[in-house]
Structures are given as C-alpha cells and as structure tokens.
Curated annotation (Swiss-Prot):
It is found in: Secreted. Keywords: Glycoprotein, Hydrolase, Iron, Metal-binding, Secreted, Signal, Zinc. Its main location: secreted. Residues 1-23 form the signal peptide. It catalyses: a phosphate monoester + H2O = an alcohol + phosphate. It comes from Mus musculus (Mouse). One of its GO terms (cellular component) is extracellular region. The lineage of its organism: Eukaryota, Metazoa, Chordata, Craniata, Vertebrata. Its cofactor is Fe cation; Zn(2+). InterPro entries: Calcineurin-like_PHP_ApaH, Metallo-depent_PP-like, MPP_PAP, Purple_acid_Pase-like_N, Purple_acid_Pase_N, Purple_acid_PPase_C_dom. Binds 1 Fe cation per subunit. The gene is Acp7. This is Acid phosphatase type 7.
Amino acid sequence: MSPFLGGWLFFCMLLPFSPGVQGAQEYPHVTPEQIHLSYLGEPGTMTVTWTTWAPARSEVQFGSQLSGPLPFRAHGTARAFVDGGVLRRKLYIHRVTLRKLQPGAQYVYRCGSSQGWSRRFRFTALKNGVHWSPRLAVFGDMGADNPKALPRLRRDTQQGMFDAVLHVGDFAYNMDQDNARVGDRFMRLIEPVAASLPYMTCPGNHEQRYNFSNYKARFSMPGDNEGLWYSWDLGPAHIISFSTEVYFFLHYGRHLIEKQFRWLENDLQKANKNRVARPWIITMGHRPMYCSNADLDDCTRHESRVRKGLHGKLFGLEDLFHKYGVDLEFWAHEHSYERLWPIYNYQVFNGSLESPYTNPRGPVHIITGSAGCEELLTPFVRKPRPWSAVRVKEYGYTRMHILNGTHMHIQQVSDDQDGKIVDDVWVVRPLLGRMMYH
C-alpha cells in the first residue's frame, strides 16, 4: 500500500468523527433555534423560549417595526438540559418573558446574544379582559415525520387566523428519539407557527421517556408543575391543561394522580367563582374518556381509567368535570377526529332534538388527534356508538372561535380534502346557571 493511499484511508476513517461533518446542530454554537412562544397567564406578557448548543446570555430585543430598530430589551435565564439517551446530549434552554406589552399590538422580536441572534419574528400580544373573541388551532399527535397538518397551520398562522395554539399531547414521535435529535427536528419544524403564536401544550404518552424530561425542559407553561398541569384565562374562557399520563405511568409516582386531582378540583372551584366573567371552562388532556376507534386503547374500555380512575373508583375525572360544569373537553391520542354528543356516564344529554348543542345538559367531547405522524390514521369500528355524533378518518386539525360568553364555534379542517370544513358546530350555553347540568 502506498503512503498516499494509507494516509487517505486513515483520513476517511477519521471523517465520521469530525465535528464539522456531523452537522451544524452537533457543533457547539450559540445561534438560537427552536424558538417558540407561550403565555404564562400574566396579562401584558409573552414568554420566548429557545435552544442553543453552548452557554450564552438570554436576551430578547423587541419593538413594533419590522425592519427598524428594536428599542426594547428583556433578559432571562438559561438552563442546561441533558437528555437521558446514551450520548447524554446537552442543550441550553433559554427563557425570557416580555412584559408591559400593549394588548392587541403587534411586535417584532429577535432573541439571542451578541454571540449570535435569531432572525426576526412577529407576534400579536394577547388582548386583556373578557370582552374579545379568541381564535385557536387545536390538535394532537403531530410528529416530525408525516406532519400533514403543519403546512396549512403555517399558512393560516401567516394569515393571522389564530391567537393561540393548543397541542393536545404527543410531539415529534418522539422527542427523546435518536438522543433527542428528533425533538430538535420537531421544534425546528413548528417554529414558523410557534414563534408567532403562544404554543400551549399538555403531555401525551409519547413524552413519557425519562420521566417526561424532554417535554418539561423544552416547553414553558404556566404554574409550577413543569407543564404537567396548569390553567390560564383567555378572553371569556378558562382553559385547563392536565396530564392523563399520571394514570398510566405509575412508576413515576402514584401520588401524582391525587395531587393533580386535588389541584383540578381547587382550580375548578376558583373558575366557577369567576364564571360570570369567564363562563366557558375548557379542558385539554391527551387520552380520551370515550372513543369509537378500532383498537384496544383505554378509551375503548367501558370503565376507562381517565373517566373512572384507578380501579374504577379512585380519582376519575368524568364525575369531577360534570360536577363543576365543564363545557368542552379536548382530547387526542386517537389519530382521527370524533365529536361526541353531550354526554355523561354513557348517556346522551342533548339540549334538544333540533339543537343538541344549544344548552347541552352534559359536557361536549372532541377528539382531535389527526395532525399527522408516522403511525398514520386510526380506523373506527364499523358501527358508530350511540353517543358518537361525527367521525372523520382524515388528516387535519380543529379551529375554535370563542365568540363571546354564550357562543362558541368549532370546525374541523381536512387536509385530505385541501382544507375543506368537514365538521361545523356551534356550542351555545346561557350565561346563568353554568355550573350545574340539569
């Protein structure tokens, strides 16, 4: 073998281990990426979260001009996150909260430090008070592969169609996969949406690895429960996010079931005391109480854990949500869309034959888990259940417009049919007597 050939082979053997070859995301740097917004519940604020690959200052510069100077500054903190995979990859998660924002005003911002800045993004500060009409995109189960709803969500976001996003669990498939590189890729994919709108979340079963560590580290939600459960107010609505996963991954602590349940009851009591101002109570949790899909998931069982609790009697949520008059319950997990008739304990409680969702006598359940992932869509059983109103086995997402304290408009958008509205329903409830279902 010639010296030249031997040297060339040695170089080729070293090449895969060269930091420059493995890609920019592996080489330590401080240019922000994976930028996303969230709302921590304090009026006039917005929180910016991003990732770098080396320590750096956490600063956001913001203003009102797209190309002009950004006169305002806000500073925050960064925390190292070490993924639980074998490579123990380290990310630096930065959080900065912008304050004293003018309600409804549009802002331009960039984040980073003198060592590296992001490009500029735009967002609209949430309006204060109860007398406005929030518009939300709602979906679950969106992966880094096959995220069918994402292109339309990007376009709708750019057109100013939404004030916030509710992602009802299951991200990336999975954020911990490939030593958390799949999580990185997913967070980059959603950036065109999440850097412009508060991207509000709840955990799903695909987040459970290493005790939900990627979920807890990457997102910034209200409260002090690491985003597992929290609530916030938006216009005439009180929105509650919670973890159905505490009922299934018991090795992370059975005490979490009771802890969350007590928190939920306390939060619902407070929400009902404020119900004149904010009549709507909306929940979001990943695994449904009911579903008519052709699989063996918990929601196909008559005594599902989320509905009835452990052993069919401990800390079930259906009785709790019914007791405090929850209006609307969003779920995902099933890779399909299903709207139920107003329901309690397997009985349909329509408002009337002609207008089932006008003054319904039970909560309305909507399963919206068809945003798109590698696991494809979930089929339904052939014959619809008597409590199932609409079933759609197509990729898409849900739009919710909370018009005022009495009227709410819900639509399902089909990506398979190029944005066609495949479900359209108004939920109407009177201002008075909201807590009790009669």
